[in-house]
Amino acid sequence: MRIISGTARGRRLKTLEGMDVRPTTEKVKEAIFSSIQFDLPQATVLDLFAGSGQLGLEALSRGAKRAYLIDYSPKALSVIRENVAAAGFSEQTEVIQTEAAAFLKSSAPTMQWDLVFLDPPYRHDTIQEMLLLLEHHVAPDGKIICEHERELELPEELGVWRKKKTYSYGSIAVTVYIYKEEVTQN
């Protein structure tokens, strides 16, 4: 696993080992970042369920200004910290050990991100729960990028969000959510 493009291009990243680990493939990561390339410069990024931190680090390498990497696993946090240091992004990164829902519930309503990566363990209720919790935490022109199993059909609309597009890559799907128009006009 490596950073694909940007200032840290080619930097190898460590990953977690085990049956429960499912890092984003390079093909899927490249597709995600191709679709958001114009959103990255100076963006503030939230990577929930960060795992190795690769999505947040790829965003920083491509011009994001700050990344918050959230994971509950102590093993994941150790790998994330090593990857952050190896990529040279320690000053631009917050690494936080907590559960994603607890983090969003405790964050001040004024804390907002331009891009949110949501790649939870494949459980059918987690993405929808996180979308609802993210309601006040995404900038008006922000996006939520959800990686999930292809079989999971996410709703066209949920709370303040509407589905912009779903991309499929084999057994994996990526769904992008943005605010409904009436929300950004108020």
Residue ranges and their predicted role:
Residues 1-186:
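Class I S-adenosyl-L-methionine-dependent methyltransferase catalytic core
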